[in-house]
């Protein structure tokens, strides 16, 4: 199974990806996580450090693939999850899609691409050009991380459009949304009414999730010294179980931009008309 995790920049994709990878490994699967972001910090919570990128390694070998071995690019992280960082082109030059393609090409040449039960691509922020959705060319499922805010759902809608486009050429499906760092889900529910798709899980605002990222650890590793965090791991295990059940998924039909803007902003304005005493949180302004 190959998964591609997308979402608005800063929404918590890498933290979610690392914990989902561990959850899948906990279920007995051999997992490879590929960071597909020039920041090359996708696997930081699994390894505890910034591992060398494939692009760095290729450049150091003058792009002689035959001189590269699996141990040069694959690092084992917590829980036995293997980790690769694709890296990216220099700022303002090159294409992220090319980097993903080179990463996949190298892993295939090393006979490593097909050794895993699950390969998870953790992909950079928004879909704004043909290069960013490149991991969808290799994925069976796309997973979108969002929150209950306007901007994240607007980005999710663009990603949904990209899934629909890529599904024309191979059997790609959208597994669903994962709500992250949100105490409410009303805006998420409003969106999926207009663009039907599963909501696999909604994680509330949990400070320890943010802290885990800073510490370079997953929640699963933190539970070794603080068993009170076991309940947080259950969110990720639930997501893993749904993915391992090989859901049918959907080929989404995105909402037109202007229609979505009207839908979400009108909903926000209706909520904002209530008084603070009624417990309404202005999630739009918190994004």
Curated annotation (Swiss-Prot):
Binds 1 [4Fe-4S] cluster per dimer. SUPFAM superfamilies: P-loop containing nucleoside triphosphate hydrolases. Its EC number is 1.3.7.7. Mg(2+) binds at residue 14. Its main location: plastid. It catalyses: chlorophyllide a + oxidized 2[4Fe-4S]-[ferredoxin] + 2 ADP + 2 phosphate = protochlorophyllide a + reduced 2[4Fe-4S]-[ferredoxin] + 2 ATP + 2 H2O. Belongs to the NifH/BchL/ChlL family. This is Light-independent protochlorophyllide reductase iron-sulfur ATP-binding protein. It comes from Nephroselmis olivacea.
């Amino acid at each position: 199974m190959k998964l591609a995790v997308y979402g608005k920049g800063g929404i918590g994709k890498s933290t979610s990806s690392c914990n989902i990878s561990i959850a899948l490994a906990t279920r007995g699967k051999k997992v490879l996580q590929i960071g597909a972001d020039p920041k090359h910090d996708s696997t930081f919570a699994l390894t505890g450090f910034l591992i060398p990128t494939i692009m760095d390694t290729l450049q150091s070998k003058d792009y002689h693939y035959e001189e590269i071995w699996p141990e040069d690019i694959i690092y084992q992280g917590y829980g036995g999850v293997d980790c690769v960082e694709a890296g990216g082109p220099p700022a303002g030059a090159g294409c992220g899609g090319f980097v993903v393609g080179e990463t996949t090409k190298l892993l295939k040449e090393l006979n490593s691409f097909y050794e895993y039960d699950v390969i998870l691509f953790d992909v950079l922020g928004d879909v704004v050009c043909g290069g960013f959705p490149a991991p969808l060319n290799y994925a069976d499922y796309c997973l979108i991380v969002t929150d209950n805010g306007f901007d994240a759902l607007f980005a999710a809608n663009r990603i949904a459009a990209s899934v629909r486009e890529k599904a024309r050429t191979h059997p790609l499906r959208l597994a669903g949304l994962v709500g992250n760092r949100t105490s409410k889900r009303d805006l998420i529910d409003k969106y999926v009414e207009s663009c039907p798709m599963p909501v696999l899980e909604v994680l509330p605002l949990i400070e320890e999730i943010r802290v885990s990222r800073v510490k370079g650890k997953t929640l699963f590793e933190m539970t070794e010294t603080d068993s009170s965090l076991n309940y947080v791991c259950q969110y990720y295990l639930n997501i893993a179980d749904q993915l391992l059940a090989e859901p049918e998924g959907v080929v989404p039909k995105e909402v037109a931009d202007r229609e979505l803007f009207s839908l979400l902003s009108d909903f926000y304005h209706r909520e904002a008309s209530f008084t603070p005493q009624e417990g309404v949180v202005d999630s739009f302004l918190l994004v």
